[in-house]
C-alpha cells in the first residue's frame, strides 16, 4: 500500500496531476478482486468486501498522501469474461 502511495507522491512532485492504477485485465490488483484468482484465506480473500480491501486501502492512502486535488483513476474490468471472475453486481458495487 505504501509503495503505491510513494509512487503517487513522486508523480505529484514531478508535476503530474494524477495517477492511473491498473486494477484490470489480470494485473496484480485484479487478481485480488477476482474470486477465480484470489484463493487467500486471510482478510484479503473470500468475501467480496475482503477481495476489494487492498485496492481500497491503496486508493485511500494515495488520497491521504497526495491530497483531494490529485486525480486518482482506478481501472477495472467491466466483465471478467472468465468463469469464476467478478460478477456484474460486484463490479458495479466496486465501481
Where are these regions (language model features)?
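Flavin-dependent oxidoreductase catalytic cores
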Residues: 1-95
Amino acid at each position: 500500500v505504501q509503495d503505491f502511495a510513494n509512487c503517487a507522491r513522486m508523480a505529484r512532485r514531478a508535476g503530474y496531476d494524477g495517477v492511473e492504477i491498473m486494477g484490470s485485465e489480470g494485473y496484480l490488483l485484479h487478481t485480488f478482486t477476482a474470486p477465480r484468482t484470489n484463493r487467500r484465506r486471510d482478510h484479503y480473500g473470500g468475501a467480496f468486501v475482503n477481495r476489494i480491501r487492498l485496492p481500497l486501502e491503496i486508493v485511500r492512502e494515495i488520497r491521504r498522501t497526495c491530497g483531494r486535488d490529485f486525480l486518482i483513476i482506478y481501472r477495472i474490468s467491466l466483465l471478467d469474461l472468465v468463469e469464476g471472475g467478478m460478477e456484474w453486481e460486484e463490479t458495479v458495487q466496486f465501481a
